[in-house]
Amino acid sequence: MSVFPGSVEAAAIEDSLAAHAATVLAVGASDLGKAGRRLMTAIRDQHLAHAAALRTTDPTDPNTAAPSAQGRTPAASPSTSPSGKKPGFAKAVDQLVAAESRAAVAHRARAMTTKGLACLLWGSLAVSSTQLTAVLRGADLAGDSPDPTAATVAAPRTRAPMPLVPVVQAEQEMVRQLHAIVYGYQLALGRLTGARRDTAAAELRRHRILRDRLTARLLNRKAEVPVADAAYVPSTNPRNATSAAKLIRQMETALVPFCGLWLAASTAPAERTEALDQVGRTLGVARRWGASLPAWPGWKLA
């Protein structure tokens, strides 16, 4: 049975990350608060889900259930130092953060040298580790009442199969989504004040710039440019600051899989880099507005 290129090494990375998270849980029994334990458990489970997927014959197909010749994912066990002694809690957390950062670099390197759904697979794992690094650095692992604006890490969920479309079609879909998002941000801005309004206004400008850049690219390709509808029905009607923030969170979260579609469709290295960065940036914005970090950034969920 064939092995998906790069999956052996990547599965080992994900196993190691799961083991690091298990170590934090093991040595931090008296240090972790309830929220910290939930966070570390979710991180461990996400990495185990990654490793399990990487051990299938085709990790880019969520419907692939058969394991490859690599076998099944082993349970993660706490790591120890060369002397056999477990690290302290703070050191264990630092080791996990460092390992996440290294994993992000390794996965991104694979994404930049592949194309299609393989590029999305590695890009998704890279964004996941990048975002988890940020979450861990900002987390109050010992606190039971964390900052309500801090995002959570979601339990792993099954991916939906991702279609592979021509790059022009992916760019057109991005423009359609950005038209709707610009409209939604304009609604939300009317209910926000102070720093949150400034943040939303900056994101609105960013979306307009991206939409204009993709529009120009489509025109250069002599492709049809989608036009904005006269109005859109928002997923949440922004009646106050709370519902305005919810609308932004929903819009940014919904955009991430379209960025993933664009990443899978990208053909030129520069565009691949741009699309991957957009997956991470959009997810980061959604997270700052309270979204949970999914196990597979850029993929639609089943």
Provide a role label for each language-model segment.
Residues M1-A302:
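All-alpha RGS (Regulator of G-protein Signaling) helical domain and cognate RGS-like helical scaffolds
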